[in-house]
């Protein structure tokens, strides 16, 4: 069907109004995630007709949400009877900002009254996470002033990532009270109830917008454009030269050199970080020479575009041993915590040496959006790598551990990585992954491409009593896709392990595609309702280009990168061949259609230290809803080992329909 110029122009203007109004509403909604309870007060009547019109406007805005009453009550009580969505948002935003300040003061007061050290840490952790949510709100609100129609697709994708991260912040706040004394945890849970509901509502509205825009198939909405050389615009000329170099620091002098032998400017990483420029928009490179660095490192939110380059994952090692058993929250046990966006690490080892007996002990926690890890090693036992939130890419890395050693709520892709199972405590099971998606609309999940699952010799000696599984659902909508990966015989025929009873078995999203090895057979896999069989079209949506918009920010970083499907997948991509050399212990794979399924050898050897630049073509596609077939549920595999469990999420949330809500969009026509 064709439209005249006036109709088309009007239609585009309407899309813009819809988007701006909705996005602003979401910004307001997410601000509330810092734990604000909005003041309750009775407003003077402005006239029955005016009130009715305002109530209708609020109801239309709240139509797609799961917690509709919370949405409506919040806007009606603070909306000054306006029918303008923009004014509703501005009013609520101003009220929320004031309440954020009040809530921060209140949390500080509660913390000062606590005697239990774990409770005090949990409250301080909540305060930190609230601060992150508020910062993200402010940045997103400012960016709305730069809104352009052709950037609509990018805006919606980023907002879904941001709202997913906000949900992670809320959940992590409450998780910190596990094992605490007193009622501080229940107090915070009640304080955050409305905020949590409003955040899920915000994600519902943005998801509705994404579905609507996707249906329209409007040309010109693929927004993020690479420069002619194939680099994102934020990578400056010096950074491009550095990241292209065969040896990452051979022809470009790093900004800072850390060396324990005194040959650099600083002997510790933390000393060096004091001199990293704040809120920098260009790359800042820290070369960390060989050595065992026993220190706890935090790349805070002001350290964006930071690059760590080591001398090899077995030579440059950052080591710690904080753990849950010694009274520290899981979130705070990380040896290295990375919050600043656009972080890159190459040729570095990270470890937590607390041991299996100390339970949760994180080596690295990653909250950095568009972060990259190449030729790195993450060693630990339980909860080794905490991929907390945002978009992350891991290439040629090794992750070792015992229980849930790869967990979190990030949208993370792992290419050509080794997942190395270690010996746990006697008779403990070893589920490898535990993804923590709380809402089905979150654009998060784990994707493994061309990886290898292997076991250390000590584990192989006890594999009959310490059974390994691909993963288990940490949260109700846990999502993990494993494709073109070598699965050994010690992975149980059931494949997946339940968390507790039937928790999440109907709502999780697990799929296995074109895997190899003696443990890859699907005949005896669990048949929970959440186990998915993906079509060829669906599989493409979980490749890096589409799933984490990787074509926008990974190419040109000196990191091997396969944009689409690997060889051996149905309809394997042919756009971007991976020209990198294979890491020792792995088979080379390319994007060549028609090749046999890859079967990388099970050696966990590290990849070469040299950085390799890649050719790149292609553009990112927006994430879209995926329809999958599901099988019937059967009895669960053997019971999960005893471990601190997560509270069951609230009532099930229906997956957003691809059909737009008529009442929601009618108010903008």
From Swiss-Prot:
Pathway: Glycan metabolism; pectin degradation; 2-dehydro-3-deoxy-D-gluconate from pectin: step 1/5
Region (Disordered): 615-669
Chain residue ranges for the region called Pectinesterase 21: 255-551
CDD domains xrefs: PMEI-like_3
Domain of life: Eukaryota
Location(s) in or outside the cell: Membrane
UniProt membrane topology term: Single-pass membrane protein
Record's compositionally biased regions (Polar residues): 616-628, 654-669
Top enzyme category: hydrolase
Site (Transition state stabilizer): 382
Catalysis performed (reactions): [(1->4)-alpha-D-galacturonosyl methyl ester](n) + n H2O = [(1->4)-alpha-D-galacturonosyl](n) + n methanol + n H(+)
Keyword set includes Membrane: yes
Membrane-spanning parts: 16-36
Keyword Glycoprotein: yes
EC annotation from Swiss-Prot or TrEMBL: 3.1.1.11
Active site as annotated: 383, 404
GO biological process, one term: pectin catabolic process
Keywords per UniProt: Aspartyl esterase, Disulfide bond, Glycoprotein, Hydrolase, Membrane, Transmembrane, Transmembrane helix
Residues carrying covalently attached carbohydrate according to the record: 52, 81, 94, 281, 300, 416
S-S bridge residues: 397-417
Expression by tissue: Expressed in flower buds.
Residue segments, region Pectinesterase inhibitor 21: 52-205
NCBIfam families given in the database record: PME_inhib
Further comment found in the protein's record: The PMEI region may act as an autoinhibitory domain and prevent untimely PME activity during transport.
Family according to the record: In the N-terminal section; belongs to the PMEI family.
Protein name: Probable pectinesterase/pectinesterase inhibitor 21
Species this chain originates from: Arabidopsis thaliana (Mouse-ear cress)
């Amino acid at each position: 069907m064709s439209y005249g110029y006036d109709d088309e122009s009007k239609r585009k203007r309407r899309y813009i109004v819809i988007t701006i109004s909705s996005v602003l509403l979401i910004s307001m909604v997410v601000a509330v995630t810092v734990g604000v309870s909005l003041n309750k007060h009775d407003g003077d009547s402005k006239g029955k007709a005016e009130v009715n019109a305002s109530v209708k406007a609020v109801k239309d805005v709240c139509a797609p949400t799961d917690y509709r009453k919370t949405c409506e009550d919040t806007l009606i009580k603070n909306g000054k009877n306006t029918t303008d969505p923009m004014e509703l948002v501005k009013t609520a935003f101003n009220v929320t900002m004031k309440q954020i300040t009040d809530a921060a003061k209140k949390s500080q007061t509660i913390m000062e009254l606590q005697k239990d050290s774990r409770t005090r840490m949990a409250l301080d952790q909540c305060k930190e996470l609230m601060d992150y949510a508020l910062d993200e709100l402010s940045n997103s609100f400012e960016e709305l002033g730069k809104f352009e129609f052709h950037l609509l697709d990018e805006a919606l994708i980023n907002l879904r990532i941001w709202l997913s991260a906000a949900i992670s912040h809320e959940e992590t706040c409450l998780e910190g009270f596990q094992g605490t004394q007193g009622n501080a945890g229940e107090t915070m849970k009640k304080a955050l109830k409305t905020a949590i509901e409003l955040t899920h509502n915000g994600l519902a509205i943005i998801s509705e917008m994404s579905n609507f825009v996707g249906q329209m198939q409007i040309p010109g909405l693929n927004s993020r454009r690479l420069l002619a050389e194939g680099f994102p615009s934020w990578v400056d000329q010096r950074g491009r030269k550095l990241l292209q170099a065969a040896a990452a620091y051979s022809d470009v002098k790093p900004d800072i050199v850390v060396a324990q032998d005194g040959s650099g400017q600083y002997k510790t990483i933390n000393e060096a970080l004091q001199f990293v420029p704040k809120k920098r928009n260009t790359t800042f490179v820290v070369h960390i020479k060989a050595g065992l660095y026993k220190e706890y490192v935090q790349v805070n939110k002001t350290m964006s575009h930071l690059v760590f380059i080591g001398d090899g994952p077995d030579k440059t090692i950052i080591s710690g041993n904080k753990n849950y058993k010694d009274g520290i929250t899981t979130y705070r046990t990380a040896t290295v915590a990375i919050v600043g966006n656009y972080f890159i690490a190459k040729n570095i080892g990270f470890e937590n040496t607390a041991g299996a007996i100390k339970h949760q002990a994180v080596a690295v926690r990653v909250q950095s959006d568009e972060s990259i890890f190449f030729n790195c090693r993450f060693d630990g036992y339980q909860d080794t790598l905490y991929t907390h939130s945002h978009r992350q890419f891991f290439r040629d890395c090794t992750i070792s551990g015992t229980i849930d050693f790869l967990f979190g709520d990030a949208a993370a892709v792992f290419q050509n990585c080794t997942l190395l199972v270690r010996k746990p405590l006697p008779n403990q099971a070893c589920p490898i992954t535990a993804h923590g998606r709380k809402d089905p609309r979150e654009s998060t999940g784990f994707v493994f491409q061309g990886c290898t699952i292997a076991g250390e010799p000590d584990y192989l000696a006890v594999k009959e009593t310490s059974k390994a599984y691909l993963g288990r659902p940490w949260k109700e909508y846990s999502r993990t896709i494993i494709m073109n990966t070598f699965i050994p015989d010690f992975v149980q025929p059931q494949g997946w392990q339940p968390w507790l009873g039937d928790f999440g078995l109907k709502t999780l999203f697990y799929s296995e595609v074109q895997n190899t090895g003696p443990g890859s057979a699907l005949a005896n896999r669990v048949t929970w309702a959440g186990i998915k069989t993906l079509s060829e079209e669906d599989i493409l949506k979980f490749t890096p280009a589409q799933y984490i918009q990787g074509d926008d920010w990974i190419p040109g970083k000196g990191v091997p990168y396969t944009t689409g499907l690997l060889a051996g997948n149905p309809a394997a991509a042919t756009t971007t061949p991976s020209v990198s050399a294979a890491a020792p212990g792995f088979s080379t794979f390319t994007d060549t259609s028609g090749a046999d399924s890859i079967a990388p050898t099970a050696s966990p050897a590290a990849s070469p230290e040299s950085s390799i630049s890649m050719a790149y073509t292609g553009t990112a596609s927006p994430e879209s809803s995926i329809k999958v077939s599901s099988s019937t549920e059967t009895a669960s595999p053997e019971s999960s080992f005893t471990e601190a469990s997560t509270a069951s999420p609230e009532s099930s949330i229906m997956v957003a329909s691809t059909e737009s809500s008529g009442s929601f969009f009618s108010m903008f026509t």
